[in-house]
Structure formats: structure tokens, C-alpha cells
């Protein structure tokens, strides 16, 4: 086989990520032709409700997975934070690329920080995780749902609908929009979504040739971090659309994992953290989840 077909969403960020994967594959496999197969997903098309309100798992994956099952694509590229905790058979993730910036960004045309926003400022985000942390930091803010791709959200800000919006740093940086970042929202005060900033490549587990072609892109240190974060989320019975945050980083030869569960309605936040071995990321994730449960996380999650 001399051609590899990558199923991808049509947004500028998704196309950038898929072309980034394609370029890396061409470099590793001279002579391999890599082409993109752009398509729309339910998550792209339903824009009048928040992701949490839509509720389906795999909102940004299903159409891409169907393309692989039909034989119309060989693999798919995803923002890892959008990937459900459990993949359907026969799908696997042979490659997780080196992580970009995991932090969130405050974007505003007038204000340089979260604390600089005026009383009652209008802030756009549909993420329950971001809403919970915004309410904790600034309970006076008016939080307004905001959906669409990065450029659509920026246009809504520029048209005066919001005083500020919250986006992922990695998405802005990948699109060459670093200058739009007014302030980074950083750990430990502010935590990102599990696996935020990481790109995952999915394929059929029963296609050994495709799996082998893709596996050369896997970044082991990134995989360890995001697997610990997702293990915590899985132990909380969470999904991509609940107010759960996590960030793991390397400390020496091991990992340090910080986790958070929040309430988007009143800004209550529960934090826990732990150190653990990179050889047992599942145990580390479970221990941080248990620390959150011990502090009352189940009650916050049950209120959703």
C-alpha cells in the first residue's frame, strides 16, 4: 500500500492537526502518500446546544470511525480530549503525539487577565469545567454558552458579544493565533481537560499494517501523562463533557497528577493530587479519583 487516508473533521484546527500527522508520517515513511478525507461530525453540526446538553459520547468521532469501518479511511486524527474514555471495538490508538501546551487561555480585546474583567463581565464558554473554575475565581461573571470552531468563537468575541472567552492555548498556537492569548490560565489554580493539548491517531486494531505505520509517531512520555489523566476521569465515571479537570507532569522518573471536580452552578471545586509510577498510570489515576471521592466528588457529579 502506498497511500494512507486520514479521516478528519473539517475545522481549521482539525485540518492543521491532521496535516501535522500527515507530514510526520511522510517524514518517517518516504514514498508513502498521505491524503486527508475531511468530513463533518455531529459535534460540528449541532451548535445550538452545549456538548453536555447533547450528551452523546463520541460526538466528534462516530462519523470518522464509520469511514474506517466502510473502508473509506485508514485512520483518524482527533484532539485527544474529545475521545471517549472507552473506544468501541475494533478501534485502538496506536499513536499519541507529543503534547502541545495543555493550558487554557483567556482571550479578550480589552482586558489582560481574569481579575481585570469588570464586575458582571460576559464570558463565553460552553465547557462545564471552565464554567466551574470561572465561578470559583469570579462568581460575579455572566457565563454565556459559546460553541463553534476557534475562528467562529473569536469572531463572536470580536463582534462584541462577549468581554472575554476561554479557549485552549494549543488550538490558538497551532493556528498561529498566539497573539490572541490575553492570559494563560495555569495549574495549580486552573486545570485543563484530561488530555488537553494532545493529538491522538485512531485506527482499526485488526489492521496490523496501518497500526505499524502509525505507531512510530507515539510519544511515550506524553502517553503516560494523558493515560493517567484519563484513568482518573474513567474512575470518576466521567466523560469529555463533565466538570472534571486533570493534569499530569513528569517529576524525575515518575508522574505527579493533579485532579479537580467542580460545580458549574456554584463554583465549588474539589482538588486532589498524588505521585506515582509512570509504569502504572491506571493506579495513579484511580488514587487521585479516590482522593476526590473522599472529599465529596460523588455529590458534585450526581448533581449534574
UniProtKB/Swiss-Prot annotation:
The GO annotation for biological process reads: protoporphyrinogen IX biosynthetic process
Q: How is the cofactor bound?
A: Binds 1 dipyrromethane group covalently.
Query: Which CDD domains does the protein's record reference?
Result: PBP2_EcHMBS_like
The GO molecular function terms of this record are:
hydroxymethylbilane synthase activity
The family database entries (Pfam families) matched by this protein are listed as: Porphobil_deam (PF01379), Porphobil_deamC (PF03900)
- Give the reaction(s) catalysed: 4 porphobilinogen + H2O = hydroxymethylbilane + 4 NH4(+)
Residues bearing S-(dipyrrolylmethanemethyl)cysteine?
240
Q: What cofactor requirement does the entry state?
A: dipyrromethane
So what EC number does this one have?
A: 2.5.1.61
Q: Which UniProt keywords apply?
A: Porphyrin biosynthesis, Transferase
GO CC, any one term: cytoplasm
- Functional pathway: Porphyrin-containing compound metabolism; protoporphyrin-IX biosynthesis; coproporphyrinogen-III from 5-aminolevulinate: step 2/4
What InterPro entries is this protein classified in?
HemC, Porphobilin_deaminase_cofac_BS, Porphobilin_deaminase_N, Porphobilinogen_deaminase_C, Porphobilinogen_deaminase_C_sf
Q: What's the domain of life for this entry? A: Bacteria
Tell me, what does this protein do in biology? Tetrapolymerization of the monopyrrole PBG into the hydroxymethylbilane pre-uroporphyrinogen in several discrete steps.
Q: Which family does it belong to?
A: Belongs to the HMBS family.
The miscellaneous remark of the record is: The porphobilinogen subunits are added to the dipyrromethane group.
How does this polypeptide assemble, per the annotation?
Monomer.
Q: What is this protein called?
A: Porphobilinogen deaminase
Q: Which organism is it from?
A: Xanthomonas oryzae pv. oryzae (strain KACC10331 / KXO85)
Q: Taxonomy-wise, where does this protein's organism fall, top ranks first?
A: Bacteria, Pseudomonadati, Pseudomonadota, Gammaproteobacteria, Lysobacterales
